[in-house]
């Protein structure tokens, strides 16, 4: 028996699930190391996801090998903790890997020189590299023959090249090897990450998936995938995130989807899947979505459009994914009666305030949900390269006064990621700030449906675009409209959805205590004061319907009410492309609202997993019933 075993610390701070990359690496180590090598190592610390526990483990076990799995959300925490470790243990073995580690030779060498406490950086896929690094550490500590790493030899950085693992079938599954058993005994993750393939054939400028060494799609065995899905069902994991870059690009992906449905039927879990669907494989994707929708695993289709601006699409490598392409996708999804959400990006090269507002308006025209991502420069992407940044004059928050907390407070913004794009040649910083704030308004009044139907009416009856209405609302003096002002300036442009109850923010009074009557009364006065619109029955009907479909705590449901004009049919006809008749041409209607998620009966904030939209609007003829689930109410969870 070996005394004084070397502790191996598997560290992924700020993580809400079993660390997938580290799990693959540790499982592969245990599978591949010789028994005498395993005997020298102590893996008993398991997976460490918070800094306090890391320090406790170090106090108990002391110096060792520290594996940091580094992402955008934990790079700063990892740097701080690893510096403390190196200061305490000069001979600690600090290994950094993960997507935030640069793979370009020049950048990798610069990174390790700037962070001399790091002993080895693993570039790209880490299973083989970490295995060989630990073997060398246990023997002669010579790393020059190990591919996919950067390290310091003497005083000089050494880059050993980069490739990918051709045969992924040799890799051990952390789920099937029992790697996460102890993790699940302590934590209750709502989600796990699975992969059925690796690689991406596309090369989008903002993404590091399709780099030249990773463009070949490599498949894991179906039997392994099926067994992992069985593990998910047996362990009652609510959500599966499939990390495949293009689910549906392979015909066999339909089989995977069918098996997920079968697992849910058998165990009641998972409740939902999150996936990146293939861009150019309509038939497979439609079949997958159709099957998973029927099983209650998806409630919406998500299209990662980024933008419809043709020049920007050309620059970022997506010129073939134009408006016509997405219109076809919309038709297919609508044929499945499936709500559609699009993902947009603010801060892409050659984009302007006009092009961004045009993207938002396109979503409104087709009644689409919207999720806006702020462009962040991550390593190993084309957009992060120095020549690319110089060409398009890309500036990040760290390079501007938007890194100053006091200035952000002064202009009404919350802290911004230091790597977030805040200006380019085509969009000044002031314009960017305006678009961030417009995004916040859009999320609140359109995304949460608070003014969705009112704005739809104004656009179709009075030619006031939704984006123009919100732009006006952003800049107009609202001192006479305190309820509107409160919601307009509530704050965070990155907060896409609003908790229904239990929210200690400016929506509390409106949602929790039913402030809708005061709010919509102000909305009417605001519209009449700022636009050439008569105070007629059509406008009042739309305002009444808008208020009627909004939820609030304690409301008695279901509820039914008669209205003078059939707004649901009017809305359906226009969104569906039928002739644009005026609302006055539609007769009476009765609208019934229901609360399938019991939102109005909750006295505390529900913990919902349902991305890309809020829950304030209730179910009715206007709003397709989209399922969700409260993680706190799942039996045995």
What are these regions (language model features)?
Residues 1-11, 31, 37-40, 55-64, ...:
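Radical SAM enzyme core and accessory elements
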Residues 6, 62, 118, 219-220, ...:
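A structural motif corresponding to the C-terminal lobe/cap of the Radical SAM core domain
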Residues 9-13, 69, 97, 243:
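Short hydrophobic segments within beta-strands
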Residues 37-164:
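Glycine-rich beta-alpha loop elements in corrinoid/cobalamin-binding modules
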């Amino acid at each position: 028996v070996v005394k004084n075993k070397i502790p191996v610390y598997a560290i992924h701070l700020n993580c809400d699930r079993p660390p997938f990359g580290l799990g693959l690496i540790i499982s592969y180590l245990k599978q591949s190391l010789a028994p005498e090598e395993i005997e020298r190592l102590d893996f008993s610390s398991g997976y460490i996801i918070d800094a306090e526990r890391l320090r406790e483990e170090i106090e108990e076990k002391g110096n060792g090998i520290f594996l940091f799995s580094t992402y955008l959300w934990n790079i700063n925490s990892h740097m701080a903790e690893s510096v403390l470790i190196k200061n305490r243990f000069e001979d600690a073995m600090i290994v950094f890997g993960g997507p935030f580690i640069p793979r370009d030779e020049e950048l990798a060498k610069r990174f390790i020189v700037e962070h001399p406490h790091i002993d080895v950086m693993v570039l790209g896929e880490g299973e083989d590299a970490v295995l060989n690094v630990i073997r060398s550490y246990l023997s002669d500590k010579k790393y020059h023959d190990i591919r996919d790493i950067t390290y310091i030899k003497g005083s000089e950085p050494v880059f050993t090249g980069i490739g990918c693992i051709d045969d992924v079938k040799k890799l051990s599954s952390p789920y099937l090897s029992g790697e996460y058993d102890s993790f699940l005994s302590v934590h209750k993750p709502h989600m796990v990450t699975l992969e059925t393939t690796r690689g991406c054939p596309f090369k989008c400028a903002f993404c590091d998936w399709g780099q030249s060494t990773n463009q070949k799609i490599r498949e894991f065995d179906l039997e392994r995938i099926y067994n992992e899905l069985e593990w998910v069902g047996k362990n009652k994991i609510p959500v599966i995130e499939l990390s495949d870059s293009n689910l549906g690009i392979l015909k066999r992906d339909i089989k995977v989807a069918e098996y997920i449905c079968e697992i849910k039927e058998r165990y009641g879990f998972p409740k939902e899947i999150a996936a990146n669907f293939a861009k150019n494989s309509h038939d497979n994707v439609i079949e997958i979505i159709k099957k998973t929708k029927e099983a209650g695993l998806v409630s919406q289709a998500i299209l990662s459009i980024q933008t419809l601006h043709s020049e920007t699409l050309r620059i970022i490598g997506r010129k073939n994914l134009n408006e016509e392409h997405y219109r076809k996708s919309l038709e297919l999804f609508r044929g499945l009666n499936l709500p559609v959400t699009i993902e947009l990006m603010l801060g892409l090269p050659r984009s302007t305030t006009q092009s961004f507002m045009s993207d938002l308006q396109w979503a409104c025209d087709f009644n689409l949900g919207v999720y806006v991502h702020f462009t962040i420069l991550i390593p190993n992407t084309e957009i992060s390269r120095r020549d690319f940044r110089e060409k398009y004059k890309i500036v990040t928050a760290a390079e501007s006064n938007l890194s100053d907390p006091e200035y952000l407070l002064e202009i009404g913004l919350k802290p911004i990621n230091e790597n977030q794009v805040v200006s380019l040649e085509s969009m000044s910083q002031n314009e960017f700030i305006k678009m961030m704030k417009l995004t916040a308004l859009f999320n609140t009044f359109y995304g949460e449906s608070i003014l969705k139907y009112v704005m739809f009416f104004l656009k179709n009856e009075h030619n006031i675009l939704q984006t123009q209405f919100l732009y006006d609302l952003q800049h107009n003096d609202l001192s006479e409209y305190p309820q509107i002002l409160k919601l307009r300036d509530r704050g965070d442009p990155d907060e896409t959805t609003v908790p229904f109850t239990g929210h200690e923010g400016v929506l509390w009074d409106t949602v929790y205590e039913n402030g809708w009557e005061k709010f919509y009364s102000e909305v009417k006065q605001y519209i009449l004061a700022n636009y050439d619109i008569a105070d007629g029955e059509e406008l009042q009907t739309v305002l009444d319907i808008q208020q009627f479909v909004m939820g609030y705590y304690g409301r008695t449901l279901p509820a039914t009410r008669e209205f003078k004009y059939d707004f649901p049919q009017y809305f359906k006809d226009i969104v569906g492309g039928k002739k644009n008749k005026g609302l006055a041409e539609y007769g009476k209607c009765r609208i019934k609202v229901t609360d399938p998620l019991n939102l109005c009966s909750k006295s505390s904030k529900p913990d919902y997993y349902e991305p890309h939209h809020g829950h304030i609007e209730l179910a009715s003829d206007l709003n397709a019933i989209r399922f969700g689930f409260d993680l706190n109410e799942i039996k045995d969870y």
